[in-house]
Amino acid sequence: MASDELPVAAAATEEEDLVEILDEGSGRLDIARYVDHVRDLAAGAIATFEGTTRDSFEGRRVVELRYEAYGAMARRRLAAILREARAAHSLRRLAVAHRLGTVPAGEASVFVAASAVHRADAMEACRYVIDEVKASVPIWKKEVYDDGEVWKENREFLDRTTTDGTTASSPAPATRPAKGGGCCGSKVRANES
């Protein structure tokens, strides 16, 4: 190597990817820290996704979201999603973080960052990670309104399993599932009165 050339930095390994689940009371997501984590001299792009609590849904005022999780399983699934993203895209570094507990309107509940030599890989990986987080990580969301509350389904992913038992490669259209449908199908019974 000539004396004026810089060495090419090695890409981070999956062991160096950042996976965080912040327990209730841990405060806001540290967005700058996650972006700094994926920053890499060989990266030409950093793509991010920040999921925030909106202040209204279908005409109702949203006060906050409340998240619960099966922590150990959620952490394992998040790490697996990052491995899947690495296998599908040429990436330098990855980070994903999700808050648990109460997230007021206007604050971030989930953040994804990906760096790559080229923007397409970073952007596609970022989209893949957030889609899979919403589809397959055991984190549940309750939407709290000024006049009530409701546990939310992620409708766009409810019908990802096809009739032959395989998983569809893309999200299902955003439609309301048939009664008794959804991720758990007939395993969940709703008492209607």
Curated annotation (Swiss-Prot):
Residue ranges, compositional bias (Low complexity): 163-178
Stored InterPro entries: MoaE_sf, MOCS2B_euk, Mopterin_biosynth_MoaE
Catalytically driven reaction(s): 2 [molybdopterin-synthase sulfur-carrier protein]-C-terminal-Gly-aminoethanethioate + cyclic pyranopterin phosphate + H2O = molybdopterin + 2 [molybdopterin-synthase sulfur-carrier protein]-C-terminal Gly-Gly + 2 H(+)
Record-level Gene Ontology MF annotations: molybdopterin synthase activity
Region: Disordered, residue numbers: 159-193
Domain of life: Eukaryota
Residues noted as binding substrate in the record, renumbered to the chain: 118-119, 134, 141-143
The protein's role, per its UniProt record: Catalytic subunit of the molybdopterin synthase complex, a complex that catalyzes the conversion of precursor Z into molybdopterin. Acts by mediating the incorporation of 2 sulfur atoms from thiocarboxylated MOCS2A into precursor Z to generate a dithiolene group.
GO cellular component, one term: molybdopterin synthase complex
Main location: cytoplasm
Gene Ontology terms describing biological process: Mo-molybdopterin cofactor biosynthetic process
Pathway(s) it belongs to: Cofactor biosynthesis; molybdopterin biosynthesis
Gene behind this protein: MOCS2
UniProt organism field: Oryza sativa subsp. indica
Protein name: Molybdopterin synthase catalytic subunit
Assigned protein family: Belongs to the MoaE family. MOCS2B subfamily.
EC annotation from Swiss-Prot or TrEMBL: 2.8.1.12
Pfam families, sorted: MoaE (PF02391)
Keywords on record: Cytoplasm, Molybdenum cofactor biosynthesis, Transferase
Subunit structure and binding partners: Heterotetramer; composed of 2 small (MOCS2A) and 2 large (MOCS2B) subunits.
